[in-house]
């Protein structure tokens, strides 16, 4: 896993203990799942708009926001990037049709 993702996951875990008044991430945790999901949705929409616009720098910027808030959601549910990477590894080598069929 990327060192950056690992370090970010560690910081996100630490933020669970911080005061919501002193940390943006801690404030998201304090507000709960619905607020975190709203942020993930907002960032997903902004990523879509950036993708449509075709500005590579903006696509990267918005994708970073999306990844960050997705990682907040993972941490809020006691998950981390390793869990997602494990699932991607499971899917690697499967055709899209095989993977979809395995969910039934």
What are these regions (language model features)?
Residues 1-63, 67-104:
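Flexible "arm" and connector segments at domain edges
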């Amino acid at each position: 896993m990327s060192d950056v993702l690992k370090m970010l996951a560690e910081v996100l875990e630490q933020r669970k203990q911080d005061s919501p008044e002193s940390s943006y991430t801690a404030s998201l945790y304090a507000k709960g799942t619905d607020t975190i999901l709203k942020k993930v949705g907002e960032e997903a929409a902004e990523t879509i708009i950036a993708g449509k616009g075709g500005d590579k720098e903006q696509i990267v910027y918005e994708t970073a926001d999306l990844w960050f808030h997705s990682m907040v959601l993972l941490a809020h549910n006691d998950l981390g990037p390793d869990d997602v990477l494990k699932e991607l590894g499971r899917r690697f080598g499967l055709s899209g049709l095989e993977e979809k069929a395995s969910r039934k």
